[in-house]
C-alpha cells in the first residue's frame, strides 16, 4: 500500500 506514514500506521494498527 502506498500512503502517508500516519495513514499507513493507523491502517496497520487498525484497532
UniProtKB/Swiss-Prot annotation:
One of its GO terms (molecular function) is toxin activity. Keywords: Disulfide bond, Neurotoxin, Presynaptic neurotoxin, Secreted, Toxin. One of its GO terms (cellular component) is extracellular region. Neurotoxin T1-1 is a presynaptic neurotoxin of the venom that exhibits indirect hemolytic activity against human erythrocytes. The B chain is homologous to venom basic protease inhibitors but has no protease inhibitor activity and is non-toxic. It is found in: Secreted. Transmembrane segments: none annotated. Belongs to the venom Kunitz-type family. Signal peptide: none annotated. Residues 1-15 form the BPTI/Kunitz inhibitor domain. Its main location: secreted. Heterodimer; disulfide-linked. The A chains have phospholipase A2 activity and the B chains show homology with the basic protease inhibitors. This is Kunitz-type serine protease inhibitor homolog T1-1 B chain. Expressed by the venom gland.
Amino acid at each position: 500500500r502506498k500512503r502517508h506514514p500516519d495513514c499507513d500506521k493507523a491502517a496497520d494498527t487498525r484497532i
